[in-house]
């Protein structure tokens, strides 16, 4: 793929610098076989960076293939998606970047708080129903 001239291994960077590094990229690529929190995916999306990552059940609600990125299963899928990205016109890339940024909104602290609040409300209702006299 001749990507070596376009890939930079930075080593450790401070948390304050993270956003600048995401903005320097065009596509977030991950070959991770397991994720515990998936913060890197949310951070990349928040910066409008589409994702290319190994298929993982925890990412089903994160990556919408062809919209805000892709998931791949095998090396061939990965290579195909890289070629697809490289061949995309500026308008198509821009649309995908916009969709990436929009999809990150579900990871905002406000949305997280709303989801947690709903869970608590459901559990309170369930408790009251089960313990009604």
Where would I find each of the regions flagged by the language model?
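A charged, aromatic-enriched C-terminal amphipathic alpha-helix characteristic of glycosyltransferases
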Residues: 94-125, 129
